[in-house]
């Protein structure tokens, strides 16, 4: 029973933030016009700071073998999701273009905004760096296999050079040459503050989108 309560306690804050986002949208406080700019800000600034903060600040060791396993696991899990969704789309006899969009949307699970706070609350924040590395594999799959599914003629490897992926690679390099000790305190504080905003704002935006559907 205590485990069940622990899980409920861990899930409650993200769900509450979703609810707040939905209520703000319904009340006109979180307007649709703000979604695009806030989404870009979250993905290109807040999320990378979140990754950098937890990877560089992580006190444990990141063994290269485990690093590779986590990346491969993230990549394979999304590819399996795409495959299953494609199979379902074919069984439903969806149009080819619709099937591709369906498989892309259905094959991607919530690997970030909901996963981080729940996993951190249940297993401790020491798990978050591992989820970030896992997400590197997910991002690679989304920007390669996923983009190819949606539009094979627009598939470009340069799409892999985006802020979240770059921040992970940069964080790993900083860890190797000294870690947090080589980052000036004021810079570290800025990264910490920006990173702390990533999950709440992301969940508020998702909640706002849910509010549009109700």
Language-model features and meaning:
Residues 1-214:
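Alpha-helical transmembrane segments of multi-pass small-molecule/ion transporters
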